[in-house]
A protein has these predicted regions:
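Surface-exposed binding/hinge segments that line
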Residues: 2-52
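Periplasmic-binding protein-like
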Residues: 33, 134, 171-215, 259-263, ...
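Gly/Pro-rich hinge or "lid" segments in bacterial periplasmic/extracellular proteins
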Residues: 35-99, 103-105, 230-231, 235
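Ligand-site clamp/hinge motif
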Residues: 62, 91-137, 180, 277-279
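Structural transition elements
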Residues: 74, 188, 205-239, 256-260
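Periplasmic binding protein-like
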Residues: 125-126, 143-146, 249-250, 263, ...
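Acidic-aromatic pocket-rim loops
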Residues: 150-168, 173, 287-348
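Extracytoplasmic/peripheral linker and loop segments enriched in polar/acidic and small residues
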Residues: 180-188, 196-197, 273-290, 316-386
Length: 387
């Protein structure tokens, strides 16, 4: 949430239905970010000792972590963690309902086969996600349909570029990822077409940029990947002083992104062919994300969706040098470029669309030339539902 409210200096009550929002500095995408603010009752928070936000990076929780405030269109009727959560329509909601539901039941089903079977049997009306390999089977059913499109989320690889020695590597006394040649070698060892066709069943969109085409600031001419070139990757590693490659630990979630663990396994296999041995740790997101947020990873796979639909969100949260508040909060590898930081600050305040786009383009070009991260693709979102 800090990513969306970190620039807010003060919120003043004007009257019962109006507030003034005061920012630290001009912030042109404030209207887009307001929709991501989750408003809670002050009285409820005070009553339940949940006024102070918790720090997910430290694994802390409070009452609000497991209980609903109930200010939305639905209210919590019952909850069995990991089993079932039942919502009923909130008759006191301040908005206008745009549905005909009386109840919504959410049932977490971690097993892909069981989830699909629940849809096919009629036990569930809608499931998300549908495993890509099951899409054709559902499409053949006369009672079911698939809704699928590319997400705004870009899946990427990050590398620790700050430590003098990686946390997980056989290289001692230096950090291979500080060398651009090594980062380029890793990039060019990855066969993105193989990942697209074999793992993503042809429905992922390969990415050369860290944002999707639907995001403000997307630059088509920069959306080009470095070519897959394993021979060139081996040459770059040798030039960087690693003719026999090296070992590195990789962290990857196995329950967050579409086929995340399978992608990481493929990346590990591809890097092995150029001499980089990847020791992969695929783990639940509850274990994975605290490590990324604390920047205790050497090499990792993650994804980002600029929910403001603006490139500034990604530049500020993922690419900027980690700093005060939410700046660089999701920059797990501590990539840092002073010029990118300067441009990001200006982009947040610039209201002239043409000037702003020029600065976004410059920032992305610098980051791309640095190989600050390695973009992979925009993953698909796939829902299965009853007709």
């Amino acid at each position: 949430v800090r990513v969306y409210v970190g620039n807010i200096r003060e919120i003043r009550k004007v009257d019962a239905h109006a507030i003034d929002i005061v920012t630290q500095e001009p912030f042109v995408i404030l209207p887009q970010t307001v929709s991501r603010w989750y408003i809670m009752s002050k009285a409820w928070c005070e009553k339940n000792n949940a006024v102070r936000p918790v720090d997910v990076r430290k694994g802390t929780e409070n009452y609000a972590s497991t209980h609903a405030n109930g200010t939305g269109p639905f209210k919590l009727e019952s909850r069995q963690p990991g089993v079932k959560t039942v919502f009923a329509v909130n008759p006191d909601w301040w908005g206008k309902a745009e549905h005909n539901l009386s109840q919504a039941v959410f049932t977490p089903i971690g097993n892909d086969a069981t989830r699909v079977a629940a849809l096919i049997s009629g036990e569930m009306d809608l499931v998300d996600p549908v495993p890509l390999q099951d899409v054709p089977r559902i499409q053949k059913s006369p009672d079911l349909k698939i809704m699928q499109s590319p997400e705004m989320r870009t899946i990427f690889l990050g590398m620790d570029q700050k430590r003098d020695e990686l946390l997980a590597s056989n290289v001692k006394g230096k950090n291979p990822f500080k060398d651009r040649k090594v980062r380029q070698a890793v990039y060019q060892a990855i066969d993105i077409e193989a990942i697209r066709t074999r793992i993503m069943r042809g429905v992922a969109t390969p990415a050369g940029l860290m944002v999707a085409p639907t995001v403000v600031g997307f630059v088509p001419e920069l959306n080009k990947r470095l070519p897959f070139d394993p021979d060139g990757a081996r040459k770059l590693l040798a030039e960087a002083g690693y003719p026999n490659g090296f070992e590195v630990g990789m962290n990857c979630p196995n329950d967050r992104y579409v086929n995340d663990a399978e992608i990481c396994q493929a990346v590990a296999s591809m890097l092995a062919k150029v001499g980089v041995k990847v020791n992969l740790t695929a783990e639940p997101k509850t274990q994975f994300f605290p490590k990324v947020l604390q920047r205790n990873v050497s090499f990792y796979l993650a994804g980002w969706t600029p929910v403001s639909q603006d490139s500034h969100n990604l530049l500020f949260a993922v690419i900027s040098t980690p700093g005060e508040g939410a700046q660089g909060q999701f920059n797990g590898g501590s990539y840092s470029n002073a010029k990118v930081d300067e441009l990001t600050r200006k982009i947040g305040a610039e209201s002239d669309a043409a000037k702003r786009l020029a600065m976004i383009t410059e920032a992305f070009k610098i980051h791309q030339d640095d190989i600050g991260h390695i973009p992979l693709h925009q993953q698909p979102i796939t829902w299965g539902m009853r007709k």
